[in-house]
UniProtKB/Swiss-Prot annotation:
Its EC number is 2.3.1.16. HAMAP family: FadA. It is found in: Cytoplasm. It catalyses: an acyl-CoA + acetyl-CoA = a 3-oxoacyl-CoA + CoA. Keywords: Acyltransferase, Cytoplasm, Fatty acid metabolism, Lipid degradation, Lipid metabolism, Transferase. It comes from Vibrio vulnificus (strain CMCP6). SUPFAM superfamilies: Thiolase-like. The active site is at C91, H343, C373. This is 3-ketoacyl-CoA thiolase. Catalyzes the final step of fatty acid oxidation in which acetyl-CoA is released and the CoA ester of a fatty acid two carbons shorter is formed. Pathway: Lipid metabolism; fatty acid beta-oxidation.
Amino acid sequence: MKNVVIVDCLRTPMGRSKGGAFRHTRAEDLSAHLMKGILARNPQVNPSEIEDIYWGCVQQTLEQGFNVARNAALLAGLPIEIGAVTVNRLCGSSMQALHDGARAIMTGDAEICLIGGVEHMGHVPMNHGVDFHPGMSKHVAKAAGMMGLTAEMLGKLHGISREQQDEFAARSHARAHAATMEGRFKNEILPTEGHAADGTLFTLDHDEVIRPETTVEGLSQLRPVFDPANGTVTAGTSSALSDGASAMLIMSEEKANELGVTIRARIKGMAIAGCDPSIMGYGPVPATQKALKRAGLSIEDMDVIELNEAFAAQSLPCAKDLGLLDVMDEKVNLNGGAIALGHPLGCSGARISTTLINLMEAKDAKYGLATMCIGLGQGIATVFERP
């Protein structure tokens, strides 16, 4: 089996879904811009040597339908000989794209792959056209299809208080804002054209979803949004709605050495796990345990961790059961997370992996973990190693 390495990773800024900079920019354009951008940063790589493009996207309809990966590749002017497939594992789609591309390289079916994902939640909302089979109610609770209610359930089971959630959300915004002000996102963001409030074109070079004014006190005034009578999860402690795309250029270690490109990280372990759909947010725990076992490592070996923040009520139980609560400030979501940056579904897996790799470089870390929950009860995890 061949070693798989990441030679570059990049993302668009996260645009606000409601009236944000990308309100007139299509998902295919965000993707095509990123595909061109990551290849422009790596002139040693001949695009014609790319075997396949794996691109995550959840709502594969409207502008994101009919294989958005291929549409974007054609818009980007990439060689028509390159294949392209759109991958859907709900929230874990672009991390699944990474796993799919990595396995193709490991088995020798490819030398170079381009992976990533996109979601324009402003143009194609998460619940657009959703039609669950009526018979599902015989197998899972109806609320299992309502992500906010699964977060409520998970939080209650683990005794997560409203105050803990508000503190976690405020931390996310504060850290993301600090990372922006200190230029820590600069290397991972590809400036992208958008529209200002007055409709004029401009280049967005930062995430516009972050709310630096967020405080625990302000969050405490918000009403529960999913269970108004008895709940604790609010809009402020849920991942923001945003539009964005992410990309990673991966290849075999032998190919990277042949081309003389810098190896930024190596894939050390990968895993998927299922869990009860009613507490879908718990998926990162079993997925991480499997990935670490396959990598021959422990959670203590991880120097930096990106745990996708679907909800504060979901992230905190995962952090607790993974033994991370005491090392949050040293290791976990050091540049904030999806509560501040948003969670464009098909984009997020490669986005958190991109942020992780940049953090690993900044901290001269050896090992890193990226993991996330997935709707209807799954988790996905990837362990990375710096050379």
